[in-house]
């Protein structure tokens, strides 16, 4: 494999990974797997929105719940905006709604991480197949 082809493949895999992080399912859409992309988008967005619905925007807490926030950030960089809005303390959440909301939003982020890894792996396999042909 020539260096130029290898560099192009790395850049393509990076683009797939970043797009999959910015928009859940976006990496699969770039790989022309429309059905997978739609399923991933609907699943992750609904899981995240259920967590926000149960616990309000206050479950995204970059100050008091950093481990949960890291998992939530795997959904999309848009979570950083929500974290900024909720860091003022204007959206207090306590007890079960807080816990359930954090769990749902964090699980959505971790699920998106699996989908990002899968999209990058599929891009890698596609690059290997094109260089062998």
Predicted feature descriptions by range:
Residues 1-17, 40-133:
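Transmembrane helix recognition focused on a "late"/terminal membrane span
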Residues 5-35:
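Long, hydrophobic N-terminal alpha-helical segment
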